[in-house]
């Protein structure tokens, strides 16, 4: 008998790229879809392409060489086709899948920003932006020709892929902090409103990931069950806050289906023998078109979320500083509950936006000293793009409401 390697599922056999015929066949498939008119191809689990005895079989040098070969072949025949790297690995490794340079070692043009996703979820659980600030500050630089795919949720589980050293410098023991996050998002932590499920628990490494829809993870499901209006409002604010970050961060924002309506966990997968053993299906339910219709009814949860995100998307489209031109600058604040950064139009430095997000359940003070030193609040007042109102600094400080954000401009 012979063995096959199945990293993810028993029915998903890993390919043996040591066999040239396998690589040629894969390139043929890529070019087939390019010839059909596909503009972007998502390459799944690229970090696991190459297997080597005695190694973790992740992020091997040969995996990068394979991607470079695929990209080179595509560049010759279909240069307009872009690759998305789905590499859910440590922050320092993800950026490597863009390639070492833009000419000789080109790999993928787009990569999932899994690090930002994990850091945002940390901020939701801890109610502060301590690790989020440190993690964003230490995100590796990307190539000019490349961009991030920024997301809050996707079809997969949530992996807590922040950097261990960043966690330590934030005052956490990495293993204990990940356990706290799993407990929080699965509702085991006292006071947590989250309704997630543990996925892929590994007793050897202690690694556990999280399944669940965005709405259920931020407490909307529990709030609706208890008919607690304050909790419903907090959950909606959190959903909008998270999306305000991915829409303003720089890159391509990805919205997962159902999130703009507050779709909850669904247990329909338990009735399917092919799905019941994979709880990721809890957030992969059939789209609820009846729920979608409620977005047209004023005051419904669906309408409140949908209208807020629709407005943010419209603003994103017309705000030139949000273009991804390596023009983001993280600003240090004295308040650990806030994430503050600036975005500047590279063609007009006077056109800029100050993004400030409050991840705490209480209103927070932003001292405008640092923003002022970067050219903001020169007249003690700025306009919030989202509300259209003026935000006035009093005693050199601005108050940001609970679980809220500002997109401020002159």
Give residue ranges: language-model regions.
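Active-site and adjacent substrate-binding regions of carbohydrate-active enzymes
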Residues: 1-410
């Amino acid at each position: 008998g012979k063995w096959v390697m199945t990293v993810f599922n028993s029915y998903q056999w890993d390919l043996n790229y040591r066999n040239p015929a396998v690589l040629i066949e894969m390139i043929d498939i890529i070019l087939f879809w390019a010839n059909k008119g596909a503009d972007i191809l998502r390459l799944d689990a690229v970090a696991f392409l190459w297997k080597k005895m005695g190694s973790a079989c992740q992020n091997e040098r040969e995996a990068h060489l394979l991607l470079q070969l695929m990209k080179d072949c595509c560049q010759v025949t279909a240069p307009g086709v872009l690759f998305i790297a789905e590499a859910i690995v440590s922050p320092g490794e993800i950026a490597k899948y863009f390639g070492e340079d833009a000419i000789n070692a080109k790999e993928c043009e787009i990569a999932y920003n899994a690090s930002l996703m994990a850091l945002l979820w940390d901020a939701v659980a801890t109610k502060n932006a301590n690790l989020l600030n440190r993690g964003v500050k230490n995100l590796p630089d990307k190539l000019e020709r490349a961009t991030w795919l920024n997301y809050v949720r996707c079809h997969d589980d949530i992996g807590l892929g922040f950097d261990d050293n960043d966690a330590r410098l934030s005052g956490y023991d990495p293993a204990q902090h990940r356990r706290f996050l799993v407990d929080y998002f699965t509702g085991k932590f006292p006071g947590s409103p989250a309704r997630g499920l543990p996925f892929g628990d590994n007793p050897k490494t202690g690694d556990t990931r999280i399944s669940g829809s965005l709405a259920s993870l931020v407490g909307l499901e529990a709030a609706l069950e208890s008919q607690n209006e304050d909790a419903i409002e907090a959950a909606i604010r959190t959903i909008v806050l998270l999306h305000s970050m991915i829409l303003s961060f720089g890159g391509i924002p990805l919205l997962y289906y159902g999130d703009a309506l507050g779709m909850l966990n669904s247990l329909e997968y338990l009735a399917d023998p092919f799905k019941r053993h994979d709880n990721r299906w809890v957030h992969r339910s059939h789209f609820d078109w009846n729920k979608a219709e409620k977005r047209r009814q004023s005051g419904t949860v669906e309408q409140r979320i949908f209208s807020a995100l629709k407005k943010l998307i419209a603003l994103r489209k017309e705000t030139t500083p949000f273009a991804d031109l390596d023009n983001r600058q993280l600003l240090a604040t004295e308040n650990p509950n806030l994430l503050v950064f600036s975005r500047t139009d590279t063609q007009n430095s006077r056109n800029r936006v100050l993004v400030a997000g409050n991840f705490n359940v209480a209103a927070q003070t932003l001292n405008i000293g640092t923003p002022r030193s970067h050219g903001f609040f020169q007249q003690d007042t700025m306009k919030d793009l989202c509300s259209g109102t003026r935000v006035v600094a009093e005693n050199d400080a601005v108050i940001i409401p609970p679980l809220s954000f500002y997109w401020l401009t002159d």
